[in-house]
Swiss-Prot record:
Catalytic activity: a ubiquinone + NADH + 5 H(+)(in) = a ubiquinol + NAD(+) + 4 H(+)(out)
Naturally occurring in which organism (per UniProt): Gallus gallus
Topology in the lipid bilayer: Multi-pass membrane protein
Family listed: Belongs to the complex I subunit 5 family.
Assembly mode: Core subunit of respiratory chain NADH dehydrogenase (Complex I) which is composed of 45 different subunits.
Enzyme superclass (EC): translocase
Keywords per UniProt: Electron transport, Membrane, Mitochondrion, Mitochondrion inner membrane, NAD, Respiratory chain, Translocase, Transmembrane, Transmembrane helix, Transport, Ubiquinone
EC number: 7.1.1.2
Protein name as it appears in the record: NADH-ubiquinone oxidoreductase chain 5
Taxonomy, superkingdom: Eukaryota
Amino acid sequence: METPLLLNTLTTLTLLTLLTPIILPPLLNLKNSPMSITKTIKTAFLISLIPTTIFIHSGAESIATHWEWQFIPNFKIPISLKMDMYSMMFFPIALFVTWSILEFATWYMASEPFITKFFTYLLTFLIAMLTLTIANNMFLLFVGWEGVGIMSFLLIGWWQGRAEANTAALQAMIYNRIGDIGLILSMAWLASSLNTWEIQQITHPNQTPTLPLLGLILAATGKSAQFGLHPWLPAAMEGPTPVSALLHSSTMVVAGIFLLIRTHPFLSSNKTALTTCLCLGALSTLFAATCALTQNDIKKIIAFSTSSQLGLMMVTIGLDLPQLAFLHISTHAFFKAMLFLCSGLIIHSLNGEQDIRKMGCLQKTLPMTTSCLTIGNLALMGTPFLAGFYSKDLIIENLNTSYINTWALSLTLLATSFTATYSLRMTLLVQTGHTRTPSNHPINENTPPAILPIMRLALGSIMAGLLISSLILPPKTPPMTMPTITKTAAIIVTTLGIILALELSSLSYSLTPPKHNPLMNFSSSLGYFNPLTHRISPSILLHTGQKIASHLIDMAWYKKMGPEGLANLHLTMTKISTTLHTGLIKSYLGSFALTILTTILLIQK
């Protein structure tokens, strides 16, 4: 059997395996269960390893498959799939991470009344992301894009009785709608100018207009929570912990970056678009890292770290290195999912407590969980030979050796330092010191569905970087020689961040609580972004609307143009007349003299 046909069959089999828990139970009158859905994803993961291995050893660059669905005689829906290094590598990674998260959710969400529905939503969420990944035309990509958006809305607002969860779900939907405007406008431009939505045909090497590219960047900004459209991502942690783990690791938030990776040949011919990505990513990564420094909610710190890493991926797109951005997506998925699962287990053990200031001494009561949390934080920092190092160090090396503006480089290095600071701060407050919140029940991490997924992801956080980086070939020759200071820049700034975190934590035990200053307020208030955008803008719009509705319609239209308008017209004429005819001799003599003077001047001319 030929390689393309074999790959096509096995990839389709993987997708069909995932669809069985959604399609078969209604058809055969069967009952679904969380365990059956988890086993389905495990099976799909094992199947997906076969086409990935075949593709890696085939030496092919990409294999495309095209079908047409004849919906009505004159209307065809193209279904085009692209099996390249990105989609073939992403399939097993996403399935492995989702399998671990769903196994954890069987324990974490055991008391939920609609747990099967919850698992079906998570499965649909994954299928939408895989559709987006394998799509070879903008139509199918848009289907996956919208599917991911709708499922995120349903999952973030899963606990509908909580006002914060409903607000966060609505916020995610609204911010993503803004991004969707950019994608729809870009698709409209492609359809009208190039008459195609096939990705191979739109990525021509000629100079591309900036407008459709800015639409794609706007779409990625909304979906991947870049600066300006970022507030929904930290708010999304109001959903259940398995949702946060899946959302932040391998599904929705990387969809925007994946869109730019897919359309990268279209993007790389326009320097304005690349510079926009670079500067936007640098600003996003620093802003999110700064906000994470003063947060006390464990899930919020991890959420801001996601936003910061997405900014780093956007910087990599701006450097014209899509393979490196994909490598960071792949390695990031393992340790970010693990961090969320560890935080979920800690929160569950401490009666729902999420404030890291109220935790402490957990390395004695939860040794395995805290060890995995430490591994995840070290991988996030870019500690040598863990998963994050292989992508993060390469990104900063390429950043240091590229001809780019120093502003973006400085912001990214500062954000890298801050990453070490907030990661170590979280580790110290959670694990060291004394117990600050006694648990109502004995803390236990011997439950296999709770601890096995975390251990699997910990293994991935250690091994994945080496494994994936050996399979993804760099698009350009990496810089072979560079000054020592350039090579060690990432390690130096990370070490500075660690020293800063240690100093701050040691001072916090001996000094009085610090007074609030503008810098601390800026970080803890999330850069004043939410009050400015979420309160002032709606307030101005509401007041303006009220004025337009009441004053203009009632007063201006009916009164000013009607009876009051007629009265005002006569009043103005009357005032002019009374001003001229005062009955005083001085006024008449003055008017007479002024008239004579004007007449003489006109005659002389």
